[in-house]
Amino acid sequence: MTVKPAKAASLARNLAKRRRTYLGGAAGRSQEPEVPCAAVLPGKPGDRNCPEFPPPDRTLGCWATDAAPAAGLCGAGSEPSIAPTSCAGNLPSRPPPLLSPLLASRNPCPWHYLHLSGSHNTLAPTCFKAKLHRKRGSQPPDMASALTDRTSRAPSTYTYTSRPRALPCQRSRYRDSLTQPDEEPMHYGNIMYDRRVIRGNTYALQTGPLLGRPDSLELQRQREARKRALARKQAQEQLRPQTPEPVEGRKHVDVQTELYLEEIADRIIEVDMECQTDAFLDRPPTPLFIPAKTGKDVATQILEGELFDFDLEVKPVLEVLVGKTIEQSLLEVMEEEELANLRASQREYEELRNSERAEVQRLEEQERRHREEKERRKKQQWEIMHKHNETSQKIAARAFAQRYLADLLPSVFGSLRDSGYFYDPIERDIEIGFLPWLMNEVEKTMEYSMVGRTVLDMLIREVVEKRLCMYEHGEDTHQSPEPEDEPGGPGAMTESLEASEFLEQSMSQTRELLLDGGYLQRTTYDRRSSQERKFMEERELLGQDEETAMRKSLGEEELS
């Protein structure tokens, strides 16, 4: 069976256009949409290595490596191709580390695998340049491509019999202007830190809520928050004190000042160090700036009359200069005349303006005087009207008060007179001046009399008590008579002399008390009243007994 080369090339182009890119390896198809491939594989003649169209003159082989198939290693048939998806010792979604990625493709090359132990599930690669292969659209020869380890085999495989189709994608068809700008950079993530990749024991799978589409407002708020945080961080970095910039001719260099090897000890070693910098050197004088020479000095000798004839060529120039000078002088004269006319007109205008300004000022002053006179007369008229109204109100109030008080005054004056607000001056003088003095004098006289009575009562009481004692003593002496106690004896004479001396002493004390005004003033009224009450009570108790005792004592004294 032979096929034309043109037909084989067209089939290769169509198959290349329908090619899909698989990024998942042995895990199956990727989630990327179908993309037509613009690049077309270079056309191969029909007699090159191709599994669909073997060359007539030689056996099938690999067109990528020009290697012949292994003897007795390939099989015939047209069964559906099977891609190896698992092998012992590795995860189902990861190919063996020593095999090429082409082994996990959908249509592996049949010329680079050999059967092991005659089974459809055991194939081994025989070509180390399988990455040069491209996926073909035709069916390879009948074989099962499965990889196994030396110790174990894969129990099952995955087959793909459905036609290629675009898988549903969770991305939106059109870009959202709010959440994703036009030129948003593509973010790349590390699959080792992706939360969607399950690690460890799949039996203890953590099931959580699916991540829904984020809200546009929330994304905008997060973006604004990040911008504010970045701006705040930049402001803090600007405000942070930094090392000043180096002077001209110098630069800052990071220098390791600590020891590279530090000894770890129980006690920290303390060392005192000092550093003295050199004194500041005097600034050298600034050299004068001398610019560099940029041109070249060239000398040229020109003889007289060599370039031009001065007398001949100066005439037109001189005519032009003289004409321009005369024209300029005429223009200056005209300008001066024009300026003089302008100054004259300005002077006339100034005079007219000054006269009009004086007239305006006179009229303004006249208007001001008229306005002030008007305001003054209005104020005077208002004051006159105000005074007239106030006077009329006062007259009306006075008439009303007189008419109202005509009957009220007599009764008010009578009540005030009865209350004592209207008084006789003579009577008032007697009440204020004479009666208080009279009461004071009477009170003094009464005090003197009360003091005299009190003193007299005290003297009488003392005499009576003494006579009573003497009388009682005399009765005792009568019961036991002795010659010296007779009535006419010396004892009686002694008692009479003592009594007379006591009476004289009491009388002298009474006179001194009466003459002593300071004593009367020092004695309070309460003390006098208490003493007076006391003496009156004692006097009432004694009564007639005291009088009789006093009479007896006086009689005995007279008899003696």
Curated annotation (Swiss-Prot):
Highest taxon in the source lineage: Eukaryota
Native source organism of the sequence: Homo sapiens
InterPro entries linked to this entry: Radial_spoke_3
Region (Disordered): 134-186, 225-249, 354-375, 473-498, 526-560
Biological role: Functions as part of axonemal radial spoke complexes that play an important part in the motility of sperm and cilia. Functions as a protein kinase A-anchoring protein that scaffolds the cAMP-dependent protein kinase holoenzyme. May serve as a point of convergence for MAPK and PKA signaling in cilia.
Record's keyword terms, sorted: Cell projection, Ciliopathy, Cilium, Coiled coil, Cytoplasm, Cytoskeleton, Flagellum, Phosphoprotein, Primary ciliary dyskinesia
Coiled-coil stretches noted in the UniProt entry, renumbered to this chain: 215-239, 331-385
Residue list for modification Phosphothreonine: T286
GO CC, any one term: 9+2 motile cilium
Assembly behavior: Component of the axonemal radial spoke 1 (RS1) and 2 (RS2) complexes, at least composed of spoke head proteins RSPH1, RSPH3, RSPH9 and the cilia-specific component RSPH4A or sperm-specific component RSPH6A, spoke stalk proteins RSPH14, DNAJB13, DYDC1, ROPN1L and NME5, and the RS1 complex-specific anchor protein IQUB. Interacts with IQUB. Interacts with phosphorylated MAPK1. Interacts with MEK1. Interacts with PKA regulatory subunits PRKAR1A and PRKAR1B. Interacts with RSPH1. Interacts with RSPH4A. Interacts with RSPH6A. Interacts with RSPH9. Interacts with LRRC23.
Name the record gives this protein: Radial spoke head protein 3 homolog
Signal peptide as annotated in the record: none
Disease: Ciliary dyskinesia, primary, 32: A disorder characterized by abnormalities of motile cilia. Respiratory infections leading to chronic inflammation and bronchiectasis are recurrent, due to defects in the respiratory cilia.
Compartment(s) where it occurs, according to its Swiss-Prot or TrEMBL record: Cytoplasm, Cytoskeleton, Cilium axoneme; Cytoplasm, Cytoskeleton, Flagellum axoneme
Protein family (similarity comment): Belongs to the flagellar radial spoke RSP3 family.
Skewed-composition ranges (Polar residues): 153-162
Coiled coil keyword on record: yes
